[in-house]
Amino acid sequence: MKPTSKASEPATPAPPQVGASPQQAKVPSNPSSAAAPVAPNPDLDRAKDIAGRITSKYPGSKLEWVKPRRLKVSVPLGIIKDVAFFARDSLGFDHIGTVSGVDWIAKSSLEVVYFVGSTTPGQEGFVLALSESVPRDDPVVPTLIDVWRGAEYHERETHEMFGLNFQGHPDQSHLFLPEDWNDLPPLRKDYVSPGR
């Protein structure tokens, strides 16, 4: 009996040797895969559509990044509440996931980022990161509690940790820090931990 030939199957390349140079470690590419059409991705298309609706309605807004079911849009100072109502009422982002801050010390600004989600049919699991930057020396943003009620404790924590002041928030007292804390907010980049 003759052994059967597997000539029609491509040979599997040997794994690269430990310590091999990048040139030696390259796996030969399959030329036929380079020409393969990219499969449509409705989740990515929907995320791009959402971003386009925000950036066309609010000039100066910028799409920071987009992935399937995930996108980040930054908005100009002073319009985040308008954009938030639009995201909720027209785009189906019906609940808040969390709120965070980013200290851009080199730019002398603080960024507030709202991560909002959707349970709208056809858009379940989508997350919009909606952000606005404010000056570090005047870190005031409007509260979005009237847009998403669940923002209350998230804004409170972000106020405590970054020093962002949420105008109109009913209670910005400490959640985690001692009541008599009088140092910089601990997640600011210029905060120095005692003993360091």
Tell me the role of every PLM-derived stretch.
Residues 1-196:
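Terminal low-complexity/charged segments
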